[in-house]
Amino acid sequence: DPTTFAQQLNSLKDVPFSAIKLGLLPNVEVADLALAYVKAHAGIPVVLDPVLVCKETHDVEVSALRDELIKFFPYTNIITPNLPEAELLAQKELRTLEDVKEAARHLHSLGAKSVVIKGGNRLDTQKAIDVYYDGEQFQILESPILENNNTGAGCTFASSIASQLLLGKSTFEAVQISKKFVYQAIQHSDQYG
C-alpha cells in the first residue's frame, strides 16, 4: 500500500542514514516513493537488489516495475540481480558467461555504477558463479555449490554489501567480503524440514 509506505518513510525523516539497501518494491507506486527517498538522501551508499521474480506478479506488473527500477540505477552504488532478474532487466535470455557479461554491460549503460549478477549454479554445475562489472573490468567470483535448502541469500548478500560500503570498503571489496560471508552463513546454517 503506497499510503502506508509513505507514512513509514515519513516516520524515518529524523533518522540519519549512513547507507540504504533496497529490496522488494511490490509495485510502481511504492518504487516511485522509494526513488524520491533515495534522491533526497544523495551521497550515501545505495544498494539495489532488484527483486522482480515473484509468483504473485503478472507480466504487465513486472514490465512496469522493471522500467521503474531502472530509474534507480544512476542513484545506486551497485545493483545485485540474480540471473532471472538480470534477464528481465536486460530483456535477454542469459545462458552463457558471455551472455551474463553482455547483460552486465547493458545494465551499466543504463546508469548502474556497478553490477553483480548472481548466476548461482545455472552457469556451471560445479560452481556458483557471480559476475561483477564496474564499467571498466569484469571480475568472476566463484564458490563451491552448497547443496542445501535456504532462502534469503540474495537479500543477505545485498545487505552485507551495504554494510561493507558503510565501513569504507570499495564496491568490489564489499562484494568479495559479502560473497564469502553469505557462503559461510549457508555452509554453517542449520537445516530443518
Predicted regions and their residues:
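Short, small-residue alpha-helix embedded
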Residues: 87-88, 148-171
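Phosphate-handling active-site elements
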Residues: 138-139, 164-178
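Conserved phosphate/ATP/ADP-binding segment of small-molecule kinases
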Residues: 62-137
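Charged C-terminal helix
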Residues: 172-193
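Short pre-catalytic strand/loop immediately N-terminal to key active-site residues, enriched for Gly-Thr
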Residues: 138-151
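Conserved N-terminal subdomain of the carbohydrate kinase-like
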Residues: 1-55, 60
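Short beta-strands and strand-loop turn motifs
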Residues: 19-22, 47-54, 80-89, 117-118, ...
